[in-house]
Amino acid sequence: MKNYSIRPYQESDYELWNTFVSAAKNATFLFHRDFMEYHKERFEDFSLLVFDKVKLVAVLPANRVGDKVYSHQGLTYGGLVYSSKLKIEKIETILDLVFDFFKSKRIEHFYLHPIPSFYLGQGNAAIDFFLMKKGAQLYRKEMNMVAQLHQEIPISKSKLKHFRRTELLGLRVVEETNFQPFWEKILEPRLVEKYAAKPVHSLTEIQLLHERFPQNIKQFSAYLEDKIVAGITIFEFENGVKSQYGATSKKGEKYRALDFLFISLLDIFQKRGKLFFDMGIVNDSGEKGFHSGLLQQKEELGCTVWNQDFYKIKLV
């Protein structure tokens, strides 16, 4: 490790960090500083940069809470991001360096949930192997429901039948840059009504993120007679897309507008050459550990289960 060095991220690293993330083989736009920092007041940043002599070879998006470090509590996933040219064996060397740095800062536990493997055409299994070798504990799994777009999508016959019926009603799918109709007329009121909850992102935040990442954050809405009845907020990546939010009005439920929108988007992104459609997790806090209704809905939309893994490692 004599040629390697490590230090915390600082504001002057903004361009260096973003350029590296853009070229890395295991990163998405969620690791761009403009995304990570839209809510920076909520987290104590503890991101790290690793150098081989003067060349940046890895970064770790992370936040600190007392004697614990997370990668990352403000993101859907985190993990060690490394150069596409980095040899696999060097990943272990870099992990050792990161853990030694943590110990020097009196960090006792490190929590990590790596980017799911289906996001990465080249895979990301090496980090899992080395984490387990270092004594990490796989303490949690979440079921990600994912449709594979590079093959025929096994949408259920009943979903397709209702799709064709709804299509005859004249529902229109619209991609729009204004998130307000969906947020204020559909998403926020339905979350309050059904779960007494709010979306993770406020309208102001999602609009800001869309302005920062117009090619990645998109809003698709279903309209019937010029009234919005459903919406899906999409995060778009190089290889695929994720439905970050999806909801429908009571009127939309009657016409199965959300399913109509999902099937329409599956077709749209399949034709655009995307490889996967991530419809999110179905875990909940109930006895089963998952939401049966959501699982069935997404399975009938052609999804299968891909795991999201969560690791923790005791450092001292």
Place the predicted regions along the sequence by residue.
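Short, Lys/Arg-enriched, disordered terminal segments
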Residues: 1-11, 306, 314-316
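A gly/proline- and charged-residue-enriched helix-loop-helix capping module
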Residues: 75-121
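Aromatic (often tryptophan-rich) hydrophobic motifs at membrane interfaces
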Residues: 60-62, 81-83, 92-99, 216-316
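Short glycine-biased active-site loop of nucleotidyltransferases that positions the nucleotide triphosphate
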Residues: 40, 69-72, 287-290
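Residue-level detector of family-conserved "landmark" positions at structurally sensitive sites
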Residues: 112, 141, 176, 279, ...
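A conserved beta-strand-loop-helix scaffold within acyl/acetyltransferase catalytic domains
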Residues: 4-53, 60-68, 116-142, 146-252
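Short, solvent-exposed loop/turn segments at the edges of secondary structure
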Residues: 73-77, 140, 306
